[in-house]
Each structure stands twice: as structure tokens, then as C-alpha cells.
């Protein structure tokens, strides 16, 4: 190990990663940081509510766009993760105490913001007996209770593949259950040492068996080949995954995995077409797409494919205006 300036010990992989300078982004990756009034209001609400959002912790490039459109993804369980993935800037450390009031506060924030569709994700909590399953389930229940009719997407960890813990989350009935595969088998252990490729596929299949809409994500640019991407997409479809997002890896800092390549917008379009041909009912593919980007649209596509009506959005009125219904088509 080596030591960083602030005294934190660096892992060997972090030292190795840091030898590669941060890469310059191609012109199609760059975004303009426009902090409009809705963004500023959302940021104030996050601070006042003592909430964590994956938008902030993961350095999402869409934060200004999504918050300006009053879309947000909530990170629960704290801001430290018990596992380390080599693409994620959320700090890996022993988390602090268990905040049982967090589900209520998240639900109240969803109501105050007038959100139509909320995505909830969690850090890994291997330090807890239930690995955070109750916290995830209770957050789903609280959002449904406080804002009846709102769509809730749970982007979950794998809970070590323990069926009893997965069932706790499934029984809360999120509109969508997401678990991200992220990469291909050949480099999976290097990128996600705390997870297992086959176990992640089994988690998605289990959610399907529970009657939930399922969703996953693949990150490109970490060393995978084009054929490996196709194989991973087919594996996800074979595991009964309904929805798929395909994204470009953006390296948050020099201690994380170097970028292997920049995938062109044309290749993202080709992958989207291939995914639809494989049989996914909803696909988002692009350099700045993230797993929770336009999540409500993909949910509607899945419901249409099932011949069912999406939930109607009847959440909080804002500035005296009645929220529009969550229509079946964009």
C-alpha cells in the first residue's frame, strides 16, 4: 500500500491506476454545467433534508439536466460502501450507524419535490445482518404510502445472493427492480471484486420470478470487447432482464480504473438496436446515459409490453399546479 496526502492508505490497485493520467474527453462527452433555479432548489432540499443522492456521490454528468427537470435518484444507507468497485467514487469504508428514519425523510422529499418517478439506490451494507434489505424495502413502502401512485425504482445491490434478503425487498413491490451487471465476465473480478457475475444474473432472474419488472446496466470503456458486450446482453436477456441501459465509463478520479476507449455515439446506437433485436423491451444507450436516466420512460415501455397501465402520478402539487398524469406514451 501507499499513503495519500490526507493520510488514507491507498490500495495497490489505486496506486497502479493513478499512474495513468485522467483522460481528455472527446467532444461528444462534454456537457455544459447550467445551474438553473430548479437545480438550485433541488440542491437546497437535499441539504435541508440531510439526504444523499447518487447524482452527487457518483458524479453523474446528467445532474444539472435531471435536477432542472426535477428528477432525482436517492442514495440510502449512508455515503460509505462496504465494497469497492473500480469505477465508483463512493468511498469504501466501514459505514456509520443505521438511520432508521431515512426512509421517511426520503419519502417526504419525494412528496415535497413533486417527483413523478423516484429511483432509490443503496450502498452495500455487509456490516448489517440483513445487508440493508429492510432499509430498501421500508423506503419503497414509505414512498408508496406518502405519495400514493408514484413509481418507485429500486436499484439494489445483490444482498450476497441470499434469497431471504432479496424477498424482503421484492415484497415491498417496487415498480422496477434494478441490479447492475456493469461489465463482462473476463474483467468482472478485476472491476467488481465484491460481486459475482453469475450471482448478479441470478438476482435479476429471481426478481423476474417474483413478478417484478427487471433492469440492468452495462458500462463500456473498461477493457471489454465488442463481442463480449453482445454476450453480456444475451446473458442478461436469458436472465429475464426487461430493461437495459448502456453507458460510457467516465473516470471520476485518478485512483479509479483508467478508461480503455471512448465509445462513439454511432456504436451506442448500434448496440441499442442489437439489444432491441435480442428482445429487451426498453433500451437507453448513449455516452451520457446512466442507469437511472429517464427511468420513467423505460418503466412505461415495460408496462406497455405487458399490456398493463403504468401507475398514475398524483404526487405533491407544486406552486398550486396539478401534476400531469403519468401518460402511457412519451
UniProtKB/Swiss-Prot annotation:
The keyword RNA-binding does not apply. The keyword Metal-binding applies. SMART domains: Elp3. Keywords: 4Fe-4S, Cytoplasm, Iron, Iron-sulfur, Metal-binding, S-adenosyl-L-methionine, Transferase. Residues 67-281 form the Radical SAM core domain. GO terms for molecular function: 4 iron, 4 sulfur cluster binding; lipoate synthase activity; metal ion binding. [4Fe-4S] cluster 2 binds at residues 81, 85, 88. [4Fe-4S] cluster 1 binds at residues 55, 60, 66, 292. It catalyses: [[Fe-S] cluster scaffold protein carrying a second [4Fe-4S](2+) cluster] + N(6)-octanoyl-L-lysyl-[protein] + 2 oxidized [2Fe-2S]-[ferredoxin] + 2 S-adenosyl-L-methionine + 4 H(+) = [[Fe-S] cluster scaffold protein] + N(6)-[(R)-dihydrolipoyl]-L-lysyl-[protein] + 4 Fe(3+) + 2 hydrogen sulfide + 2 5'-deoxyadenosine + 2 L-methionine + 2 reduced [2Fe-2S]-[ferredoxin]. Its main location: cytoplasm. Pathway: Protein modification; protein lipoylation via endogenous pathway; protein N(6)-(lipoyl)lysine from octanoyl-[acyl-carrier-protein]: step 2/2. Its cofactor is [4Fe-4S] cluster. It is found in: Cytoplasm. Its EC number is 2.8.1.8. It is an enzyme of class 2 (transferase). SUPFAM superfamilies: Radical SAM enzymes. One of its GO terms (cellular component) is cytoplasm. Binds 2 [4Fe-4S] clusters per subunit. One cluster is coordinated with 3 cysteines and an exchangeable S-adenosyl-L-methionine. PANTHER family: LIPOYL SYNTHASE, LIPOYL SYNTHASE, MITOCHONDRIAL. This is Lipoyl synthase. It comes from Cutibacterium acnes (strain DSM 16379 / KPA171202).
Amino acid at each position: 500500500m501507499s499513503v495519500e496526502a490526507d493520510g488514507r492508505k491507498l490500495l495497490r490497485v489505486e496506486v497502479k491506476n493513478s499512474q495513468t493520467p485522467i483522460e481528455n474527453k472527446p467532444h461528444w462527452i462534454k456537457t455544459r454545467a447550467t445551474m438553473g433555479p430548479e437545480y438550485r432548489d433541488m440542491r437546497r432540499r437535499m441539504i435541508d433534508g440531510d439526504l444523499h443522492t447518487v447524482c452527487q456521490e457518483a458524479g453523474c454528468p446528467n445532474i444539472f439536466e435531471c435536477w432542472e427537470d426535477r428528477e432525482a435518484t436517492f442514495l440510502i444507507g449512508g455515503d460509505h460502501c462496504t465494497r469497492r468497485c473500480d469505477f465508483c467514487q463512493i468511498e469504501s469504508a466501514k459505514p456509520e450507524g443505521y438511520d432508521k428514519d431515512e426512509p421517511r425523510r426520503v419519502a417526504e422529499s419525494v412528496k415535497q419535490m413533486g417527483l413523478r418517478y423516484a429511483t432509490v439506490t443503496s450502498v452495500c451494507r455487509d456490516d448489517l445482518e440483513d445487508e440493508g434489505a429492510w432499509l430498501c424495502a421500508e423506503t419503497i413502502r414509505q414512498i408508496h404510502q406518502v405519495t400514493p401512485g408514484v413509481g418507485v425504482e429500486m436499484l439494489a445491490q445483490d444482498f450476497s445472493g441470499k434469497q431471504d434478503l432479496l424477498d424482503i425487498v421484492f415484497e415491498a413491490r417496487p415498480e422496477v427492480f434494478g441490479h447492475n451487471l456493469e461489465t463482462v465476465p473476463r474483467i468482472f473480478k478485476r472491476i467488481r471484486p465484491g460481486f459475482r457475475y453469475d450471482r448478479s444474473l441470478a438476482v435479476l432472474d429471481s426478481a423476474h420470478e417474483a413478478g417484478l419488472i427487471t433492469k440492468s446496466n452495462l458500462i463500456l470503456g473498461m477493457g471489454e470487447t465488442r463481442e463480449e458486450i453482445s454476450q453480456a446482453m444475451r446473458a442478461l436477456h436469458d436472465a429475464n432482464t426487461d430493461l437495459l441501459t448502456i453507458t460510457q465509463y467516465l473516470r471520476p478520479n485518478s485512483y479509479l480504473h483508467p478508461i480503455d476507449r471512448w465509445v462513439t455515439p454511432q456504436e451506442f446506437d448500434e448496440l441499442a438496436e442489437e439489444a432491441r433485436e435480442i428482445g429487451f423491451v426498453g433500451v437507453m444507450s448513449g455516452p451520457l446515459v446512466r442507469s437511472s436516466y429517464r427511468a420513467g420512460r423505460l418503466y412505461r415501455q415495460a408496462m406497455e409490453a405487458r399490456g398493463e397501465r403504468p401507475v398514475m402520478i398524483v404526487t405533491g402539487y407544486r406552486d398550486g399546479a396539478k401534476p400531469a398524469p403519468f401518460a402511457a406514451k412519451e
